[in-house]
Amino acid sequence: MILLDISSIDLSLISTIVIPPIAGSIIGYFTNDIAINMLFRPYKAIYIGKRRLPFTPGLIPRNQERLAQKVSDTIMGSLLTPEELQKLAKRLLKTERVKGAILWLLNLALKQVKSDKQQKTAKILSGILEDLFSESLPRLLKALARRQDFLEGQINQIFDQILLDFKLTDTQARQFADWLLEGVLPPDILRQALVDFLTERNIQVIDEGVREKTSGTYWVVANLFGVRNTLLRLRSFCLEEKEVANTRLKEILLSLEVRSRLREWLQSLSLQNLPVSTVRQLRKTTRETVQLYVQQSGEKFIQDFGKTVDWEQLSILIINRLQNSAALTTSLETISEELALILERYLEEDLEKIVAQAIPILSIDKVIIDRVNATSPQNLEMAVQGIVKSELQAIVNLGGILGFLVGVFQTLLFLLR
C-alpha cells in the first residue's frame, strides 16, 4: 500500500522541490565565468552590413585604452608612489647589494683586462697619460704657479729634510775629489790656466803691486830684482816644456796633499755649518728660484718630458704589473666597500631628488598603458580566469552555495503556498 502511495506522488511536485536548489547552485557556481565572458566577448565588433551590433565587442575590448589609463592611474596613485619608489630604491641599494655589484663589475673589468689580446686597455691608458702630461698637467701647473705660496711647503720640507742634512760620505768625497783633480782640474788644465793668467798686463800689475805694497827685506828684493822676470820665465816654461810643467804641477799637488785636503773639505761641507741667517736666506733663495723656474719653464718642461716617454709601452708595462699584482686582487673588496659607502652617503642626501627625476625618465605610467594596450583581449580574459580559479575559488564556491540557498528558499515558498 505504501509503495503504491510513493509511486503515485506527482512528478511535477518533485521537480518543483528539487530543481530550484540544483538550478540555483549551477547558476551561482558558473555566474563568475559567465560574467567574465560577457565582459570580454565578443573580442571584436560584429557588423551586419555597415551597422555594428550593439554590445560588440565586449565591454573591456571596447574600452581597453580607457582601462589601461585607469590601471596606470591606480598603480601610480596608490602602489608606485614616489614614497614607495624611494623605499624600493633603498631596499635595492643597500650597502651589501651595492658592494656586491661593484665588486662584480671590478672583477669583470679585471678579467676583461687580462683577456685583452689587442692591448686595447693599454692604448686607452696611454692616451690618458699622454693627454695628462701634454695638456692637462701643464695647464694645471700654469694655473697653480700663479699662487705666491705654490710649492712653498714642499720645497721647504725638501730643503729641511734632505739638503740641510746632506753630507758626503768618505767614499763619495774621495770619488768627488778624484773627479775634480783628474777630470775637471788635471795638471794640463792647470798649466793652461796659469799661462792664460800670466799675460803681459797681469804680470805688470803683479810686479807693480809687489813693489808698492812690500816693505823691509821684501821691498829691497822686489825693487832690485822684481818678479816680472820670474813670472815671464814661468810662463815661457809652461809654454815650451808642457810635459815637464805638467809633471811638476802633479808633483806639487801630491806634495801639498791637495787630494786629501780636498776630500776632508768636501766631507766637512754641510749647510748645518753655516749661520742660521744664512741657511734661512739660502732656503728662501732656493724656494724662489724653484718657483720662478716652474712659473717660467715648468709648462714647457712637462710637455717636453711627455714627448720623450713611450706612453704605449709604459701603459703595457703598468697593465702587466697590475694583472700580476696580488695586492690589486685583494684590494678589490676594500675598494668596492668604500665606493658603496660613498654611494650610500650620496643617496642619503639626494635619493628623493634622484627618484623625482627618475620617474619622468622611466615613464612607468606609459609603460603600464602600453603593456595593457598591447595585451590581446584573449590574454586578458585568460589572466582574469586564472586569477579567479587560483585565488578566488572560494568566491566561486560561495556563489554555488548562495545559489543553492536561494533555490531552497524558493522551494520553501512554493510549499508554504
From Swiss-Prot:
The chain crosses the membrane at residues 395-415. It is a single-pass membrane protein. InterPro entries: DUF445, UCP032178. It is found in: Cell inner membrane. It comes from the Bacteria. GO terms for cellular component: plasma membrane. Keywords: Cell inner membrane, Cell membrane, Membrane, Transmembrane, Transmembrane helix. Belongs to the UPF0754 family. PANTHER family: UPF0754 MEMBRANE PROTEIN YHEB (PTHR35791:SF1). This is UPF0754 membrane protein cce_2569. It comes from Crocosphaera subtropica (strain ATCC 51142 / BH68).
